[in-house]
């Protein structure tokens, strides 16, 4: 199961929060982003109860985190599949 956790973070705490988030089991990637949220965290776990533990038990306790929204991925599309599906007659994906 893959989920993305969209985080509101105190602006002064973004680097430290990102570093702490990277150390959490189940967190595979952390991005600093523009827009409504400050950080986006990719979480990969096997079960719903693990996701609940990571999001509420660990991510939510990182200093500087002010709020979150979690979205669960239904399906993953690779770059190659997307490139092929939206190709306008340019280069074909290798593979």
Where are these regions (language model features)?
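A compositional/biophysical signature of low hydrophobicity enriched in polar/charged and small residues
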Residues: 1-95
């Amino acid at each position: 199961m893959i989920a993305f956790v969209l985080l509101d973070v105190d602006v002064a705490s973004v680097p430290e929060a990102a570093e702490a988030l990277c150390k959490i089991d189940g967190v595979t990637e952390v991005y600093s982003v523009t827009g409504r949220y400050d950080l986006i965290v990719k979480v990969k776990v096997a079960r719903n109860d693990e996701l609940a533990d990571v999001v509420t038990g660990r991510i939510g306790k990182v200093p500087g985190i002010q709020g979150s929204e979690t979205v669960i991925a239904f399906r993953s599309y690779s770059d190659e599949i997307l490139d092929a599906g939206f190709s306008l007659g340019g280069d074909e994906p290798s593979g």
